Amino acid sequence: MILSIESSCDDSSLALTRIKDAQLIAHFKISQEKHHSSYGGVVPELASRLHAENLPLLLERIKISLNKDFSKIKAIAITNQPGLSVTLIEGLMMAKALSLSLNLPLILEDHLRGHVYSLFINEKQTCMPLSVLLVSGGHSLILEARDYENIKIVATSLDDSFGESFDKVSKMLDLGYPGGPIVEKLALDYRHPNEPLMFPVPLKNSPNLAFSFSGLKNAVRLEVEKNAPNLNDEVKQKIGYHFQSAAIEHLIQQTKRYFKTKRPKIFGIVGGASQNLALRKAFENLCDAFDCKLVLAPLEFCSDNAAMIGRSSLEAYQKKRFVPLEKANISPRTLLKSFE
């Protein structure tokens, strides 16, 4: 088995993945959302301290799963990029300590690659090559995944990410953090869902294959300020619905542009924000229109988790892509390459 560790942001997670058949044997996770909610977003120093507390607790649960028999573990895998430096280092320190004390090889995994492999948790075979939309609080990307060693970025955000824009809109409406499920609930509760969009869809007339949410976010801010004296539940629902609709339409618009040139046969959607049901439905329709197979990460593995890191590290284990402890470092940025 491979013991995998994830600590790139505000989720502490450990998992055990069986090497021979890619089955997830154990998966434990502690979310920090309640600790960061009063700040309206993740506080790096607080996240780091909580990882220092939570990772050892999760390791104890792993020990119980193993009946304290660590001989079953053949390698340690750790997310080392991208993410918050102060949280990545917490996971890396644990991984190094385990690697040294158990005399096991160390595997460094890219967090974005891990999200791609969230599509294949509990599956020995992958469906690569495929294209992937990754939407989360930190990223809005289209990736082309040819195989484990060839995953490249073909489109990214010029400013805010998809998930981050939901957090900021929720904060404007004084509704808390994380904003994804809050704004989604507003949209679901809105009673006039067939109205024309009140907010502009970003980059509608731009030829660039990219994402941008800052203009949409600013349009929401102006609407909130205009309605400040009467920002009741119905107004918030209307704003939430129209914002979400415009944000998803932007993703669809840009992905359609990509589809017209690349014509992928398989398209995946991953990342924490991919839990949004309206987004999933919109992409079902898009993929149907282009005769493209849609694959979705299971809802429980959309947000950051060690199970996806364990699954991706199986490929590294088979290829013996191990890293000496003295060369094991972190990076706040991904080293996945962008296509020219």
Curated annotation (Swiss-Prot):
GO molecular function: iron ion binding; N(6)-L-threonylcarbamoyladenine synthase activity
GO biological processes: tRNA threonylcarbamoyladenosine modification
Cofactors, names only: Fe(2+)
Reactions it catalyzes: L-threonylcarbamoyladenylate + adenosine(37) in tRNA = N(6)-L-threonylcarbamoyladenosine(37) in tRNA + AMP + H(+)
Positions annotated to bind substrate: 134-138, 167, 180, 276
Location in or out of the cell: Cytoplasm
GO cellular component: cytoplasm
Keywords: Acyltransferase, Cytoplasm, Iron, Metal-binding, Transferase, tRNA processing
Presence of keyword Metal-binding: yes
Entry EC no(s): 2.3.1.234
Cofactor mode of binding and number, as noted: Binds 1 Fe(2+) ion per subunit.
Recorded superkingdom: Bacteria
Gene3D superfamilies: 3.30.420.40
Binding site for Fe cation: 111, 115, 304
Family: Belongs to the KAE1 / TsaD family.
Function comment: Required for the formation of a threonylcarbamoyl group on adenosine at position 37 (t(6)A37) in tRNAs that read codons beginning with adenine. Is involved in the transfer of the threonylcarbamoyl moiety of threonylcarbamoyl-AMP (TC-AMP) to the N6 group of A37, together with TsaE and TsaB. TsaD likely plays a direct catalytic role in this reaction.
UniProt-recorded name of the protein: tRNA N6-adenosine threonylcarbamoyltransferase
Source organism of this protein record: Helicobacter pylori (strain P12)
Lineage of source species: Bacteria, Pseudomonadati, Campylobacterota, Epsilonproteobacteria, Campylobacterales
